């Protein structure tokens, strides 16, 4: 009797492990499917050579990609647009990064089972990957306005601003000023004015750009020839820093 009881307990335990395993596989498949829907749309848009407007409402994710391929042939565009699945915040679930050259055009994560767009990047508002779950945002709104921000992706898939510089023309002194905050907004009332020349600001831009990491991209031309791979694992330390 005792042996039967032990056998039943072991059988129940094995069944639980099996069901948990199936649940995990289903979750992974679901994440792949959600990301694949986005990649399918991008692939179709680039392959067809049609404007992003033909794919419904005006969407930043499509516009960001279209900006970089509109002057290319469909074949060139499919080679130029890249993607990678990478766990950026150490939660064990990959984010979807899309880009061209080493510039990110889109970052997606999954929130509550739905695709969540973290950001879209354009030529004049560009994003780059710094490694360890961190990102660089560099943009310009003309000769008198530039931004330079550093961010990391938290465990909930939100961007957290670590440092944000921006330039501002002060008509009172007829001079460009540099401001800094950790809010990620170009608001001088929320910022600290820095004793920094434009030349120093330019050198800071160059210094941070030199820290940009090269990603293990796969081209859209290769998309569909195999399942997308999760590349790279990140872990979060007790201090909340993401490490590889």
Predicted regions span which residues?
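Blade-edge motifs of beta-propeller repeat domains
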Residues: 29-77, 115-126
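Sec-dependent N-terminal signal peptides of Gram-positive bacterial secreted proteins and lipoproteins
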Residues: 7-28
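Acidic/hydrophobic-patterned starts of short beta strands in beta-sheet-rich repeat architectures
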Residues: 88-99, 134-137
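A glycine-rich, hydrophobic loop/mini-helix early in the fold
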Residues: 69-84, 94-96
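Beta-propeller blade termini
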Residues: 79-88, 126-134
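Acidic, small-residue rich beta-repeat scaffolds with periodic aromatic anchors
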Residues: 28-51, 138-244
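Beta-propeller blade repeat segments, especially FG-GAP/WD-type strand-to-loop junctions
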Residues: 105-119, 153
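N-terminal secretory signal peptides that target proteins for export/translocation
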Residues: 1-7
């Amino acid at each position: 009797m005792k042996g039967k009881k032990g056998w039943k307990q072991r059988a129940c335990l094995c069944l639980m492990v099996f069901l948990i395993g199936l649940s995990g596989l289903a979750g992974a498949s679901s994440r792949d499917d959600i990301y694949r829907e986005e990649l399918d749309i991008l692939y179709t848009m680039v392959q067809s050579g049609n404007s992003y407007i033909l794919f419904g409402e005006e969407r930043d994710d499509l516009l960001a990609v279209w900006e970089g391929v509109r002057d290319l042939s469909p074949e060139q565009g499919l080679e130029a647009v890249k993607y990678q699945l990478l766990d950026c915040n150490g939660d064990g679930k990959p984010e979807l990064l899309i880009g061209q050259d080493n510039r990110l055009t889109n970052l997606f994560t999954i929130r509550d089972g739905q695709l969540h767009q973290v950001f879209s990047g354009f030529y004049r508002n560009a994003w780059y990957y710094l490694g360890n779950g961190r990102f660089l945002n560099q943009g310009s709104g003309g000769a008198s306005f530039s931004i330079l921000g550093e961010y990391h992706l938290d465990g909930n898939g939100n961007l957290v601003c670590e440092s944000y510089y921006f330039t501002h023309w002060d008509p009172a002194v007829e001079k460009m000023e540099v401001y800094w905050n950790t809010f990620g907004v170009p608001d001088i009332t929320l910022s600290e004015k820095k004793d920094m020349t434009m030349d120093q600001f330019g050198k800071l831009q160059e210094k941070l750009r030199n820290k940009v990491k090269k990603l293990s991209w796969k081209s859209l031309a290769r998309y569909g020839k195999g399942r997308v791979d999760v590349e790279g694992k990140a872990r979060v330390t007790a201090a909340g820093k993401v490490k590889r």
